[in-house]
Amino acid sequence: MRYRQLATGTLALGVILLIDVLRVWLPGIITIFGQAASTPAELMGAFALGWFVLALAAPAVVRRVGARPVTVVAAVVLAVARLVLTTAPGGRTQLWLATAGLLAGLVWLVGTAADTDRPVPGLALGFAVNAALHAVLDTVDLVWRGDWVAWLLSSVAVALFLLGAALPGTRAGAALPGTRAGAALPGTRAGGGGARAWLLAGPVLLLSGMVALSPALARTGMSYLFVGDGVARSPLFGMAPVPVAVAGFLFTALTRPPSRWGRAYGPVALLVGAVLFALNRGDLLLAAILLAAVGLGACLARTDDASRPENGTVSASAADPVGTAATSDRTGDRTVGGRAAARRGYAVAAGMLVFALGAVGYYSAYDLGYPNAAVPVLVAGLIAVVAFADPSVVAWRPGPFPPLRTAGAVTALALLAPVLADEVPVASNRDGPPERLTVVAYNIRMGFGLDGRFDLTGLTEAVRQQRPDVVLLSEVDRAWLLNGGHDTLDLLADRLGMPYVFGPAADPVWGDAVLSRWPVTDPRTLPLPAVGAPTGAQALAVTLDLGDGVRTAVVSTHLQPPPGQGPVVQARAVADFAIGYAAGRPLVVAGDLNTEPGDEAFGQFTNAGLADALTAARPLATSPADEPREQINHIFVSPGLTPSDPVAVRSTASDHLPVAVTLTLPPR
């Protein structure tokens, strides 16, 4: 069956809008519905999974009502929700808008699956274009921008999607010339065409968002190439891997899969990429991305039932525009087409449930403390098995768009990212050495404010108004799909004009950072003992080169207390590491220490000879940001550094307040 270009474009646009909604909905689970590290992860996981389980009822609704009315209504709800989310309302309004858009998107996928037996071109195009746009937008989606450009582009995308959904005939196309709908081609057999491809929609969405087509992960991977020893720095051309990954994914997805032994390269590449990602090593991220991208595309191509005769059976509507296909929809399992449509609907609903299970299973580990490395490997294994399930491809036919030109066009879009989205701030000590340093320590909660909005502006202003020389950040997220796939560190560094050094804690993309307007040398990271804490912790040490041989050591950390205890063991480890690293030079240790003045963990720093730089302003509560009650964000300094003007800056751009202090350096 000839798959129409309009159907492919509409499917791709719908996928793009659904991913946009997901990037708002997923962070809302841990910032609005609940709070990471305080709300039980089981409760947040149940909330997330419930909507995907509910979507399993959609195929029955489609079979009873008919695909077209269900698809059109769901498309309208998805489009409206996506457009309204551009206002970034925050709070419960944002959460329920995104939830409505998500559920509508799932139902729309089921309805589309009932009428689309060759979804691979549309799915692949949607995933690839979304990744390219995400890269060009520097991982800040239109939803969070709110300016006239965001509204214009969002409105155009929504209008085109609704137009495609409303036009008649935007389905899987007519029967092949010379055949009737439902007729088998010579040498082929009837079956549920497209079901395997639809089953993979959810798993491919998960791995493309986490690994293969993640611009934030690509930039993070590039940042690990400049230092080594598990530390990352501001990279040159951080987005350069994105066009390569997009090209590899889209070209392999749209071209004829190899036969015989060549058909194994896709599953093998995908599995190797997933394993490299699961090893949690920053220096392996680029290889994981490129292998996973090519592997995902090749596996999708293996499920492209372009030669199946059932491609004609399902779309009787195309052969009978008068409307008998609608009757066929309502008769359900009495026809081959009805059974095939139902299989596709249940397949895509089940595949999206796999997406939810994988996402919840992977990210809940950071609250519950179990190993999660197997999750991406298991999802990759599922994709590989489905791709291998039926190796017979008889008379493969090209899709609606030429593979080479299509991949080239989307790659050209992605190539704009290194030009438009890559900024590299430069540090200099030409004006040094200074007499004073202003230090800011801030737990940025992955970039999300108390209302659940991705609030780069608020974070930037809270820091910038202190005119800092060095900024120490905690809870820095650089690519988690759960948080929308942003590289929050690079975004803040660009806006503050300060290069960064990053130390991984929970995994290669979540940890602590130091931003400095002075050159930084000798970065080191120390993994801290977990002692029962579910989330990993580390201490990142750097040396500020202030000019004329003047050096100051800075250590950024985020202590993770064991359940019901204080982070005493970690505090002692950080204090010992910092004192040894400084080796007599002036020293600053700061971050979210999860301990209060007078606690045993707090005493580990003072017992090591460090002074509380915020003493003059005590009590100085910093959490929660809207009603501060706890003093858990601190700055310690070595003797010889004289603190002044300590302050906790009022802001709700995070759930913590930033603390700042000015330090007078020892006389030279």
Question: Which functions belong to the PLM regions below?
Answer:
Residues M1-G9:
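Start-transfer (signal-anchor) and selected internal transmembrane alpha helices
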Residues R2, D20-T31, G45, V65-P69, ...:
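Metal-dependent phosphoester-hydrolase catalytic domains
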Residues G14-A55, L83, A240-P241, A245, ...:
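Active-site beta-strand/loop signature of hydrolases that rely on acidic residues for catalysis
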Residues S38-L54, T71-A74, R92-L102:
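Hydrophobic alpha-helical transmembrane segments in multi-pass integral membrane proteins
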Residues G369-A373, E423-V426, D431, D451, ...:
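Structured beta-strand-rich core segments of catalytic domains in phosphoester-bond hydrolases
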Residues G408-R453, R585-P586:
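Mobile, glycine- and charge-enriched loop segments
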Residues G452-T457, G485, R618-A625:
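N-terminal post-signal-peptidase region of extra-cytosolic proteins
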